[in-house]
């Protein structure tokens, strides 16, 4: 019992669980993105490795691990090797303070559903995520390649420029909530969707939310802000000279940053793990209904499938989904499983937006990219913060 109650043991267990789930999520985010873009372009996407391509991430990992790890002779080797490590470390470190749910009680153990609960969690994420640009800048410089250098410089300028409107967009809901703790920030949005920072307060933060999402796309170097990796201009940008797992580290860092900014948007504006309406009106039944319907649909397609493999895989996944629907009805797990569902659903919706935008929009020119933030986004973010601050001060006198 003393071991279970020990802070070190609980922290190690949480770290192992979060790391394992995160690595699996990073691997499958690429599969989901390829599927989403494929369906946008009316093609099947990954389909051969495993049922419906579900084992494609495993095949990609094996391929990257077994590929030859080339180090060009003309690079600055210490900085060249440090760059991908720095990028992925900063990306993973920022996730360590994100709360996935409320404080939970498991037997004698009481713990928060996050790696560590900092009272300055928002500030920590801003500081750590900003350091990720050093990894990209070092990669561009150490590669001793003109395309890599231009990509690194573009990324540095872009991330620094869009950090300002993002910080101003974050400051507005913080003024309303009056806290830098991510857990407390979510707890102050409890009740219903009308209490979320997006819609509540003296000045609903719709503008802040839009600015934050736009800046998040730029911060993560995603379309339409992927100028540092513009293939038609820079070959592959800052990671042109990288191969094997060092190459994969930059992609893992990109997807980890996507998860971080999506989770931040959920926590700051969308009520975190809070349901959109109270449990008395049936919010606790939503996961069971969704998984139950999905399971029945999969069973139906399995019965009517043409291919032999589909006759096995569809019913198997249908039974799994029906089992998950039943688990959500168990009172003993609802206290932590329902909040986790709502948090993942909101974060997943924003991640889907990242993929949707990639499949539909072209990239900006570099002058348009920089002009947009300094001439439009930054002034609007500043004006929004001033109006929010004035109204908060006026209503709390």
From Swiss-Prot:
Chief localisation class: membrane
UniProt entry keywords in alphabetical sequence: Cell inner membrane, Cell membrane, Membrane, NAD, Quinone, Translocase, Transmembrane, Transmembrane helix, Ubiquinone
Bilayer disposition of the protein: Multi-pass membrane protein
Pfam families given in the database record: NADHdh
GO cellular component, one term: plasma membrane
Transmembrane segments: 7-27, 84-104, 120-140, 156-176, 198-218, 258-278, 279-299, 313-333, 337-357, 376-396
MF GO annotations: NADH dehydrogenase activity; oxidoreductase activity, acting on NAD(P)H, quinone or similar compound as acceptor; quinone binding
GO BP of this protein: aerobic respiration
Database matches in InterPro entries: NADH_UbQ_OxRdtase_su1/FPO, NADH_UbQ_OxRdtase_su1_CS
Primary enzyme class: translocase
Superkingdom to which the source organism belongs: Bacteria
Reaction equations catalysed: a quinone + NADH + 5 H(+)(in) = a quinol + NAD(+) + 4 H(+)(out)
EC numbers for this chain: 7.1.1.-
Subcellular location: Cell inner membrane
Subunit structure of this chain's protein: NDH-1 is composed of 14 different subunits. Subunits NuoA, H, J, K, L, M, N constitute the membrane sector of the complex.
Similarity field: Belongs to the complex I subunit 1 family.
Function: NDH-1 shuttles electrons from NADH, via FMN and iron-sulfur (Fe-S) centers, to quinones in the respiratory chain. The immediate electron acceptor for the enzyme in this species is believed to be ubiquinone. Couples the redox reaction to proton translocation (for every two electrons transferred, four hydrogen ions are translocated across the cytoplasmic membrane), and thus conserves the redox energy in a proton gradient. This subunit may bind ubiquinone.
Name this polypeptide is given: NADH-quinone oxidoreductase subunit H 1
Organism: Solibacter usitatus (strain Ellin6076)
Upper lineage: Bacteria, Pseudomonadati, Acidobacteriota, Terriglobia, Bryobacterales
């Amino acid at each position: 019992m003393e071991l279970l109650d020990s802070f070190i043991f609980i922290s190690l267990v949480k770290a192992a669980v979060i790391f394992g789930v995160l690595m699996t999520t990073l691997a499958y985010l690429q599969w989901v993105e390829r599927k989403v873009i494929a369906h946008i372009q009316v093609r099947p996407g990954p389909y051969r490795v495993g049922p419906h391509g579900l084992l494609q991430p495993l095949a990609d990992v094996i391929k990257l691990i077994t590929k030859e790890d080339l180090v060009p002779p003309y690079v600055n080797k210490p900085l060249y090797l440090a760059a991908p490590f720095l990028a992925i470390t900063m990306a993973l470190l920022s996730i360590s303070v994100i709360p996935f749910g409320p404080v939970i009680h498991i037997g004698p153990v009481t713990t928060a559903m996050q790696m560590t609960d900092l009272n300055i969690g928002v500030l920590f994420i801003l500081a750590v995520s900003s350091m990720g640009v050093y990894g990209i800048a070092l990669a561009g410089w150490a590669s001793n390649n003109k395309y890599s250098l231009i990509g690194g410089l573009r990324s540095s300028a872009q991330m620094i420029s869009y950090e300002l409107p993002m910080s101003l967009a974050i400051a507005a809901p913080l003024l309303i909530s009056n806290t830098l703790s991510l857990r407390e920030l979510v707890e102050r949005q409890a009740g219903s969707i009308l209490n979320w920072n997006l819609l509540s307060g003296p000045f609903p933060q719709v503008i802040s939310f839009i600015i934050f999402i736009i800046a998040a796309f730029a911060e993560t170097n995603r379309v339409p802000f992927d100028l540092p990796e513009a293939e038609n201009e820079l070959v592959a940008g800052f990671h042109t000279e990288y191969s094997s797992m060092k190459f994969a580290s930059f992609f893992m860092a990109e997807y980890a940053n996507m998860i971080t900014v999506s989770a931040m948007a959920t926590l700051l504006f969308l009520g975190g793990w809070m349901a959109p309406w109270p449990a008395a009106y049936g919010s606790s039944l939503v996961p069971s209904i969704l998984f139950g319907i999905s399971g029945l649909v999969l069973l139906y397609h399995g019965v009517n499938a043409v291919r032999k493999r589909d006759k096995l895989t569809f019913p198997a996944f249908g039974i799994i989904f029906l089992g998950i629907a039943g688990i959500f009805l168990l009172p003993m797990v609802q206290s932590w499983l329902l909040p986790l569902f709502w948090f993942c659903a909101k974060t997943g919706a924003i991640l889907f937006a990242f993929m949707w935008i990639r499949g539909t929009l072209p990239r900006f020119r570099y002058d348009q990219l920089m002009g947009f933030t300094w001439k439009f986004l930054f002034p609007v973010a500043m004006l929004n913060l001033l109006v929010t601050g004035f109204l908060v001060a006026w209503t709390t006198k």
